[in-house]
Amino acid sequence: KEFGVESTDIFLPDCFGFGWTLPTIAAHCSLIGFSSQKLDWRVHPFFGKSKHPFTIGVWKGIDGSSIMLAHGYGYGKRWNDVDLSENKELMELAERTPLKTVYRYYGTGDIGGSPTIGSVRSVEKGVKGNGPLQIISATSDQLFKDYQPYKEHPELPMYDGELLMDVHGTGCYTSQAAMKLYNRQNELLGDAAERAAVGAEWLNLADYPGTFLTDAWKRFIYHQFHDDLTGTSIPRAYEFSWNDELISLSQFSDVLT
């Protein structure tokens, strides 16, 4: 269920702002949609009285390419065994958009974990319910697929610009640039080491160093955490992070040499 599945959307509930290049890069990677809930963390409104341009619509990138954008309304929502087809909060959220549609995250956000039993039962009751709301339990990209192609849906509002934060992680595209450099070097060197190791074993020149490579991968991937690689941790933390990144670079280099 986890492997061999191709993603068609960008699912970033808890990242720190989104550049104007994101829809362009996503569209050229054949992705069709993007969702987050982070913009509600803004201190000040950016679009009139709202913190985001719309809840569901189309986001245009710097070259005119576009993807669909949906606002997830918080990542820690829980319900306690209720019929969501009659949920007043969802009704109110639906009224905020001309589409009369709500894209809603739920589960145990931030600290991690699956949705509670009560939340799952609520969704199941909502799907089978007879209230005024039609509840659809779906993958994160289903809404985007339902509106394909976007050009045939003029009712979708469009935004052309950046979606930046004004607090909590602002500037993380450039903060701790060394971490970003080391991470990318490890990704490239790790890939090269894997290919070389497989080729060497196929030619009966050397045994595949599976344990060694796994250790190298895990050591630097561990730091692809959104308060580490992004550059939002305290300075002291990066003394440990840099060390791990450099050890992995050395390990991958050893495989190649």
Task: Annotate the PLM regions.
Residues 1-257:
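Catalytic-domain carbohydrate-binding cleft regions of carbohydrate-active enzymes
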